A protein has these predicted regions:
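Ser/Thr/Pro/Gly-rich, low-complexity intrinsically disordered stalk/linker tracts of secreted
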Residues: 25-210
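Bacterial N-terminal signal peptides that target proteins for export
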Residues: 1-12
């Protein structure tokens, strides 16, 4: 059990290095952290977190690759999958860092999420929603479950989690601009639909930030 936990930490370090190498000419070094909600227990829900530096460029797209061994269920739309906490720097509020809280829900696709998926260039098999609130505003960010491509499957990944974020660094009034001109700094969510392996082993998570 401890071996599996150590490899998760190692995978996060490798992901951070990969993300940095891919953006060597920009200020951008995001980090991915994956943990268990049950400590070293096997088979429980999964907690996923991302962190981006306050001085880093804004994130547009995040793809998280789920390794073989983890099971991704198909919850019924309307199911509460877990809690979400996040922080974002709001340009319209002088750069104030806003704490956001909410929940991760399984939802049925709708016109808004379908447009978001098309903009991301993906065909999701499931649609989840990061339902957040801060400063009297509600923010819904689609999180898509996407089947991996054949080369990704060959590398040992069973699913992809994809989030495409609205731009914060465009003029006020631009269609699709993020609320408050908010730039994501961190987000952590728990999903009961992503269960950990039932056997100890080496499980490497990988991510791509752009």
């Amino acid at each position: 059990m401890q071996k599996a936990h150590r490899m998760l930490v190692g995978a996060c370090a490798a992901v951070a290095t990969l993300a940095f190498a891919g953006t060597a000419f920009a200020s951008y070094a995001p980090k991915l952290v994956v943990s268990s909600t049950g400590g070293t227990a096997l088979g429980g829900a999964t907690r996923i977190g991302v962190v981006v530096g306050a001085a880093d460029d804004a994130t547009a797209n995040t793809t998280i690759y789920v390794p073989n061994g983890y099971a991704v269920g198909t919850p019924t739309p309307g199911t509460d999958l877990g809690k979400v906490t996040a922080t974002a720097a709001a340009a319209d509020l002088g750069g104030a860092v806003l704490p956001l809280t909410g929940e991760l829900d399984a939802i049925a696709p709708n016109a808004t999420t379908q447009a978001a998926a098309q903009s991301c260039g993906i065909t999701p098999t499931q649609t989840w929603d990061l339902h957040l609130s801060a400063a009297g505003q509600t923010l819904d960010i689609p999180l898509f479950v996407v089947a991996p491509l054949a080369p990704e499957t060959a590398l040992g990944f069973t699913q992809k989690l994809v989030v495409c974020l609205p731009p914060p660094d465009v003029p006020v009034g631009t269609p699709g601009r993020s609320v408050f001109g908010a730039k994501l700094l961190s987000a952590t969510f728990t999903s009961s639909a992503i269960t950990q392996p039932t056997a100890a082993g080496d499980y490497r998570w990988t991510s791509l930030f752009t």
